[in-house]
Regions:
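Histidine (H) residue identity feature
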Residues: 7, 16, 67, 107-110, ...
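N-terminal regulatory/effector-sensing and dimerization cores
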Residues: 26-131
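Short, Lys/Arg-enriched, Trp-marked, Pro/Gly-tolerant hinge/linker segments that flank
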Residues: 128-141
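Generic structural signal of hydrophobic/aromatic residues within well-ordered alpha-helices
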Residues: 11-14, 21, 36, 121
């Protein structure tokens, strides 16, 4: 069975890291794991990042280092080549198997948030379920 989520050994494989990054994993009220992981590699192994198992979850990624001309992929195809700027946050929908070509040093803080965790927060707050979040790569906030 494929491991879901974006933390631990899985993120090590995806980003071709030498060491497994530490992750803070929290369990939401509905028993869903939410994780925060810092990744950094000053001398990365070049190549396309590993395959993400499609799931109904999001990665909120705060970029801590510039990454110019980032070749971004979805569903096995290059879809954009934006300049990533430190201090900018990006949202990735894991249903679209996001990936990128690793060819430069990188440093990011990733938050793995399953859609069911967002639904639980909405339910607990008496709000409508979130549904689909609009993830337009290359447009940070």
């Amino acid at each position: 069975m494929a491991q879901s989520g974006f933390h631990g050994e899985k993120i090590k494989e995806l980003l071709h890291l030498r060491d497994t990054p530490s992750s803070l994993i929290m369990r939401s009220v509905r028993g869903v794991n939410v994780a925060a992981t810092e990744t950094r590699d000053d001398n990365p192994v070049p190549g396309l990042s590993g395959r993400i198992v499609p799931e109904d979850a999001y990665i909120v990624s705060l970029k801590l280092r510039d990454y110019p001309d980032c070749e971004y992929w979805e569903n096995g195809k290059c879809v954009a080549k934006p300049d990533i700027r430190a201090g900018t946050t990006y949202l990735y929908d894991m249903k679209y198997e996001p990936g990128f070509v690793i060819e430069k040093p990188f440093h990011s803080l990733h938050f793995y948030v399953p859609a069911s965790a967002l639904d639980g927060i909405a339910e607990q707050s008496g709000a409508r379920r979130v549904g689909q979040l609009d993830c337009q790569y290359g447009t940070g906030f």
